[in-house]
Amino acid sequence: MNDCAMKEIRRFNRYYTAWLDVMNEGSYMDTDLSWPEARILFEIYICPDITATGLCEHLRIDKGYVSRVLSKFEKDGLLTRQTVSGAKGQKRIILTNAGREESERIDRGGDRQIEDKLGCLDEDTVGQLCRAMEFIEETLSNLESEEESKNER
């Protein structure tokens, strides 16, 4: 990859994280959670049988950090953990009613954010944007698959 392309990709990453407004300290989506905490809670919401190990693998984040966040959520009454039979040391993470409500608030906030930022675009432009995002996701997923294949050999 040439230097110009690398700089452009990094510039876009900085632009997009700023556009999403995820770097602000403090609450995210009208919750008392930081962006990483909100993301972890939302992943539990959309993957109801996930374990801490599954979260770490899916989000590619540190086990210690996930453990601290899950302990905080448990203390705050947002989740419970249930031992998975036959899986040594694994516990399924289960949202409480309060955890589901918080996740739904995050979900609604995400919808509102996208509507506020992109609602003025016409359908053709939104379609182009979605196709561009699909292309990026597919390209990066293919790279991951290739890397995994190389590592298995």
Question: Where are these predicted regions, by residue range?
Answer:
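Charged, amphipathic alpha-helical coiled-coil/dimerization segments
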Residues: 71-130
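N-terminal helix-turn-helix DNA-binding core of bacterial DNA-binding proteins
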Residues: 23-65, 70, 76
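Terminal interaction helix/tail motif
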Residues: 5, 108-153
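N-terminal leader segment of winged-helix/HTH proteins
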Residues: 1-35
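A structural signal for well-ordered alpha-helices, especially hydrophobic packing surfaces
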Residues: 20, 48, 103, 137-144
